[in-house]
Amino acid sequence: MKNILKVFNTTILALIIIIATFSNSANAADSGTLNYEVYKYNTNDTSIANDYFNKPAKYIKKNGKLYVQITVNHSHWITGMSIEGHKENIISKNTAKDERTSEFEVSKLNGKIDGKIDVYIDEKVNGKPFKYDHHYNITYKFNGPTDVAGANAPGKDDKNSASGSDKGSDGTTTGQSESNSSNKDKVENPQTNAGTPAYIYAIPVASLALLIAITLFVRKKSKGNVE
């Protein structure tokens, strides 16, 4: 009887370790970092805004949806951001470094994704007065994994991007649109491959079945010993 209980306890411990290991593996596969660049809208040319985005970004999959967490420097210059029509969800700020980290829902982690950015500057830059107020489209080029996908759909952004140039306080041009884009953003189709492997869900079921079988076996042996 003692040997049976020892085997039973060992089996239970092994099952717990196996389930914990595979759960951690599943979570690890659905989060990580990705490198990216910021392009002028609908081009392969690096945007002047690229330097204000810290790399790499972080990605995470929650409830079947994909999210990226992006950190910007010169945070007080960047008054608003959106990706695929999804407005930023600010998750942390560092006032001392003038940085903030924002989370966006996205349709994929690899390839081009369109976004919008609002910039307002009214201060001295390089010792000279500078005023800039502009809203324009940009394109993110994500270099993340292709095997992590979500059921995300592009959101709706009711803000139309501005075009043309802005005027400074002295009447001179201080900024220009990244691109003469149309009012409608182009969004590539989301990935359709599966996210979490099926075996991740099968392991707990198989473990439970094995546990039930062992329990019935121990009970049967116990009754036999009593009789």
From Swiss-Prot:
UniProt induction comment: Repressed by fur in the presence of iron.
Binding site for heme: S47, I48, Y132, Y136
Main location: secreted
Alphabetized PROSITE patterns for the sequence: NEAT
UniProt signal peptide: 1-28
Residue ranges annotated as motif NPQTN sorting signal: 189-193
Lipid bilayer topology: Peptidoglycan-anchor
A Pfam entry, by short name: NEAT
GO CC, alphabetical: extracellular region; peptidoglycan-based cell wall
Residues bearing the modification Pentaglycyl murein peptidoglycan amidated threonine: T192
Subcellular location(s) per record: Secreted, Cell wall
Gene Ontology biological process terms, A to Z: heme transport
PANTHER family in the record: IRON-REGULATED SURFACE DETERMINANT PROTEIN C
Subunit organization: Monomer. Interacts with IsdA.
Family: Belongs to the IsdC family.
Listed name of the protein: Iron-regulated surface determinant protein C
Organism, scientific name: Staphylococcus aureus (strain NCTC 8325 / PS 47)
Gene: isdC
